Amino acid sequence: LYRFADDRHHRYSVPDLDEPERLVASHDGATLNLFVVDDGDHGVRRLTLPWAQDEVIADVMPLVEPSAQTDTVALFGDAADDPAIWLNRKTPSASRILGTDKKAGLHVYDLNGTETQFLAVGRLNNVDVRYDLEVAGQRYDIAVATNRDHNSLHVFLIDPDTGELEDAGQIATGLEEIYGLCLYQDDEGLYAFPNGKSGAIEQWLLRAEGDALQGALVRKLQVDSQPEGCVADDNSGRLFVGEEDSAVWVFPAAADQPAQAEQVVAISERLHADIEGLALYHQGDQHFLVISSQGNNSYVLVDAEPPYRWRGRFRIGMNVAQGIDGVSETDGLEVTSANLGAPYTAGLLVVQDGRNRLPQAPQNFKLVPWTVIDHALQLSENGDSHE
């Protein structure tokens, strides 16, 4: 390994290597961490080097480790996109992760990351989940995804006992290039908020009629440029929308409210474009909005209530012991505060990994226990914000 500095090349070596096979590097602004897989004894060697750069302010933030990862999608390239978490309310440890595949359909995984089901229904972009809807005289949970092949809402019924998904058809929208989506539920019913690349956002009321789900357009909203990530808070009635190159906005989610937006947080030195996935974490008096800051491979937390105070940011590094690489260029993410069993007793964050390494493979999703995020940002210790 060579580094050019001070007008000359400096040579570094990793000792005790027989057959170096793969090299993974991570840089935290001050040090370079190298992990080399030795194909001879199948061990992993770590070398830490001083790697600070003069005249550059280091963008250093806490690192957390993933505890697990899902099976990969089938094809290389930009395929995996947005996860959702379905909570098995009878047996939380049997909950499922739904992951969209922009080239093929919808993947379903257990909490170990093993794929349990795949629905080859076309190019799905974003997905969200809600619970306890009556369809054809039976109670189902429901998942809705945006289908880019038909600019539609693709509906799936979820067996509340097993987590098995069933394709329940599509609802056409008025969007020309459908993109992101989130669901919202209040006393008036279940709503879907699909958005398009033009900045248009539609609000659809979803109702069961016979053995199918039908939709009615009830409201239109707008941001100036391309959005994608969004999340609705059923309790507070707030709809958060990420405008990728600009800011996170909040709208009233109720269909009878004005379509007027308020800025939550804007692109800055701490939040980098693209703004991608958004998710909400609620536990006791903690109410956080989690944001994918894709441009600098990090995640931002702000309060999910006015004045939307800054809480901190972090990155997801590699778990060497488990052979799981770190995460970069995250599109979608999802979080739950439900106790899913160890190690997810305080909840779970699931993120899409844009570059799946160690070894090089198609994209997948990484799982992070909320406890490590809570510890890294000192969220439970006091009310201060942290870098």
Question: Where are these predicted regions, by residue range?
Answer:
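Sequence/structural signature of beta-propeller domains
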Residues: 1-387
